Amino acid sequence: IQSLDRIPEENLDEIVSDMSLEQSATYLKNHYKINKQEERIISEVLNFISDFYEYEVNLMPGFKEFISHYDSINVIGTSCDEELVKIALNRLAVLNYFEDIITCSKVNKSKNDPDFYLACAQVLKQRPEDIVVFEDADYCIDVARKVGFKVIKIKDWRDLNEKCINDCGK
């Protein structure tokens, strides 16, 4: 946005964090009056964030230790680009722990839409009440709980213990 001589909103990250890339591009185009096609905006956004995913993004503390102890089917539900997520997970040596990556773009729903979580349940072939969602964003926690998922709020994976898992965030 700054490269277009526009001042980004202070909370722009929060605004677009639950949107698909397509939704983000439309928002940016309309809100900042950008005279480019959405496809071009998406391309520029991906170029901007790809280095971060490829070289800088890290796991939350304790995540690798946590996931290595559980033999369950795991999927990632994310608003990020699937290829960028795969690059990061591969670099961090945890890609093999996941069966699938469900993106907002793949299901054409944002993470603030209950259908996003229901699509993840379909991939897992499980009912929402039989799935535990680990989430760090409050708005996502509320949406997932509303459609019957058990949710555990995560800020640091080292904080998880057996009681937390058994309670499933109730």
Regions found by a protein language model. Give the residues of each.
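Helix-loop "lid/cap" segments that line or gate small-molecule binding pockets
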Residues: 1, 20-35, 88, 120-121
